[in-house]
Amino acid sequence: MIKGSKICGISDLDTLNFIINHSYPPQFIGFICNYKKSSRYVEVEKLNELLKLDKKKSKFVAVLVKPDEDILEKIKHLPFDYYQIYDCTAEEIKEIKQKYNKKIITALTIKDETDVKKYQLFYEVTDIYLFDSKGYEKSMAFDHALIEKIKINKPLMIAGNIQVNDNLENYKKIADIIDIS
């Protein structure tokens, strides 16, 4: 059953203001912090300005692809509630979680069933699982049926070319949270 939503790739103040002050704001708002290939990438200086806004009920999420020490140090003072991490090992995520004291959304990119099974490696270090496509900046889709049978005691989020005008009923039995780009 869908319990929340995340809008990802926010990069301007007008959009951020609109969604935060909406009658039904998203539970999570994501900012692309270090993946420069994305058209939604936001420089740290701009993040400083955007994140001064009162987030009200929403949680701010730093979206990080294989983050290095440099970016983690640059954003550590920003009011992120979660770090959404792609392409790191469980050990690397554990170190980040301990050092920066952030909740973790472990992002797993999915192409086939082998990719899905990797979620078990991250159970101890993740607060929320995100199953996404391998498309990154291309917002590609993946077969969501691959994750229908997963039963875990942690929230499950799905992404992968989910659009606001999609029939969201299709995702109710799969995920707790949907990530709309």
Task: Give residue ranges: language-model regions.
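Conserved N-terminal beta1-alpha1 strand-loop-helix module at the mouth
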Residues: 1-179
